[in-house]
Structures are given as structure tokens and as C-alpha cells.
Amino acid sequence: MKLWGGRFKSETDKLMEEFNSSISFDIRLLKHDILGSIAHAKGLYKAGVLTEDELNLIEKGLKEILDETNVGEIPNDEDVHSYVERLLTEKIGDVGRKLHTGRSRNDQVATDERLYLRDEIDKIKEDLIKLIDTLKEMAETYKKAIMPGYTHLQRAQPVTFGHHLLAYVEMFKRDLSRLEDMYKRVNVMPLGSGALAGTTFDIDRKYVASLLGFDDITLNSMDGVSDRDFVIEFLSFASITMMHLSRFCEELILWSTKEFDFIEMDDRFSTGSSMMPQKKNPDAAELIRGKTGRVYGDLITILTVMKGLSLAYNKDMQEDKEALFDGIDTLKMSLKVFTEMIKTIKVKTDNMEKAAKYGYMNATDFADYLVSKGIPFRTAHEIAGKVVLYAIERNLAIEDLPLNELKKFSDVIDEDVYEAIDLKNTLKKKKTIGAPTSIQS
């Protein structure tokens, strides 16, 4: 069913119809298109455009379509809007043709997308909270498990695995904050903007918005139909969240190698090789890392679509939906898979602590010890560096060097140095808020 055609002399080319059609992907908006149409019909009734009987007939018909429609084979309509209107007209007759009064597909689809995204935000919020809670529980379990902290992927200073996990909790909390803040900009209704210049019918937009649970209405009709900032903002959020997942996955992949051997992935989230019998591959983590680029692509798609569009609506904007839907689907699945995967890893705490001990990661604490004895930090830093080199050449840890050898570097060094550079003590001595102390981890 076409919703236009009166001014055309010839039929649309079949190739153009196929090229123009969006029903294959915007059918996903069916529920929200119907909900928006029911609210619009009530607005038309309040404005005196529909009689009470007509409203009841339209509402009943739309609800039946929602209950009855099981989209298997993609219908042969231009888009979800024409599909719903065709079904309604077939069901209730010419009264169905009144539904689109005072409405354009331009404000209709913008409303549908906001309704849809609003629901998806609620689901993603639940997934993020579940991930954050999972990481917090694991951090409590491993709050005393010492491991190397890295800069430049080189061993730097000792931390705890619990503290490392809580670093990602902070990232995902920021993601959650972005998601919650975004909701207020998504939850604004453009319906009533018409094609671009409003409508002559006295539709109470705030009344319709209240029926649909919107907090507010858009205030400029041209912006209302052409705004896709909410899609861009969501995909920006999704890209940042996926980036955080990808960083964590990269670490898990590294840690699962024999070269690190800090963790072992569970069989349920690993795969094997068709040729090499010994292989156990961290495919779940690798796929999340790979799909991050896919979500970046979704964001770049809509940014590129929008960058050259004059006001108001342009058909280019049809291309926003597949990017939005793909970004939502990919993020949701990645969050679910990651949460289940991280819960099942085997953490090799002994290997982590061993790596921390033999990485000279107490060198900074050695320098701080010298400072506590009155030596300026720059001098202490140089002395500590020489001690590290001395220990490396002898294949020893700093704490394994005898006191008489340490005294060669400075006569302020005494027996208490060994307590100062003990790994567990170095962690306990960290005093600043946010440091990896047992309380904070």
C-alpha cells in the first residue's frame, strides 16, 4: 500500500520500489508504530477530528493488529507505517484512512524510533547494572590477590586483582551515567510536527505525549522531524561502552596465554581449532573485541548520513535505522556474553603474585623509603634505578639482596627497608583515596 501517488502520472519503477523500501528492517518498529497511532487517534478525537465511535473502532483495530500480527515473511509494503495503515483499513474500512490526519511519516517515524529506543535503554540499563554488580562481587573475592599493575604493558607497580576489576566498574558506571542522562533527551515527542511545519488541526501535543509517557514535546517542528541527535548520542554511548568491554577483553585474551598464565577461560566461552587439537581459543572475548569496530561503524554511518543534510527531513535519514538496530543488538549481546564469561574465568592468583614479585615493582617504594630517610626524591629515584639494575644482573629480586650490598648504594638503608618494600606492605601503605588498599578493593 502506498501512502502517496496522487500527483504522479506513472507507476514507480519496480527497481525503485525495491530500493526505496524499508519494511525489511523498520518492521521492528511495528509495536511502537501502533502505540503511537493509538495515541495520535486519541489526540484527533480530542481535537474533534474523530468521533468517539471512530476512535473506538480505530483503537480496537490497531490493538487487534498488534495482537494478531506475527511477521514471518516480510510484507510487500513500502514501510511499517503503510503496512499498519493497510492492515487497519482492511480490518475497519474507510475509517482507517482518517488515522493519518494531521500526521506525516516524518514525525511518525521520529516518534516510533524514540519509543523504541526508550524501551531498549531500559533493557541495556539492566544489563549494565548486572555487569557492574558481577564485577563488584568478584572484586570483593579478589581484594587481596596481588598482581602486577602495568603501564606501557610493562610491569609497573603492584595492585590487587580486585582493584583492577574496580577500575572497570568505574568505566561502566560512567557508561551507566551517560545512558541515564541520555534518556531525558530521547524521551521528547516530535509527533505533531507534521512533515516540517506542524498541522492545521488543533491537536494537543502535550496530551498525546502524556499518553505515550514522554516527558516533553519538541518545540520546533523542523528540528522535530529532522533531529537524529538521539540516535547519534546513543551510538556514541554504545561505542564507548563497547570500547570498555574491548579493553577488558584484550586483557583477558593476554592473561589467558601461557606467556601470562593469569587466568583460564571456561570451556563454555572458548572454542577449538579444526586443525590443531591442543588449541583452546578465547573466541567470546575476541568476538566482543571485533564487534566493537562494528558499533563504531554504526556511529560513523549515522554521522556521515547527517553531516550534509539541509533542513528538514531527507530520505537519507532512512539509513539511521539499520545502524541503530545493529548497535543496540550488538551491545546487548556483548554485555550479556561478557557478564557470563567473566563470572566463569579461573583466576590463577599464585601466578599473578609471582609475576608481581619478580617484576621489580617495589622500586618506587624503595625510592619512597629513601625519601623517608631524608634523601631528595630525584636522588632517591636514581639510587633505586641503580639497585634495580644491580638486582637484574644477578637475577634477584630487590628484597633478596643482602643488607650489606644494599648499603653500598646509600648508608641510610637499614634493616627496615625489607618491611618497606614487601609487596603486601607496599599496598597497605598507599594512603590516597582511590589507591588499591584492601578497604577500597
Swiss-Prot record:
It is found in: Cytoplasm. Its EC number is 4.3.2.1. One of its GO terms (biological process) is arginine biosynthetic process via ornithine. Keywords: Amino-acid biosynthesis, Arginine biosynthesis, Cytoplasm, Lyase. It is an enzyme of class 4 (lyase). Pathway: Amino-acid biosynthesis; L-arginine biosynthesis; L-arginine from L-ornithine and carbamoyl phosphate: step 3/3. One of its GO terms (cellular component) is cytosol. Pfam families: ASL_C2, Lyase_1. The keyword S-adenosyl-L-methionine does not apply. It catalyses: 2-(N(omega)-L-arginino)succinate = fumarate + L-arginine. Its main location: cytoplasm. InterPro entries: Arg_succ_lyase_C, Argininosuccinate_lyase, Fumarase/histidase_N, Fumarate_lyase_CS, Fumarate_lyase_fam, Fumarate_lyase_N, L-Aspartase-like. One of its GO terms (molecular function) is argininosuccinate lyase activity. The keyword Amino-acid biosynthesis applies. HAMAP family: Arg_succ_lyase. Belongs to the lyase 1 family. Argininosuccinate lyase subfamily. This is Argininosuccinate lyase. It comes from Thermoanaerobacter pseudethanolicus (strain ATCC 33223 / 39E).
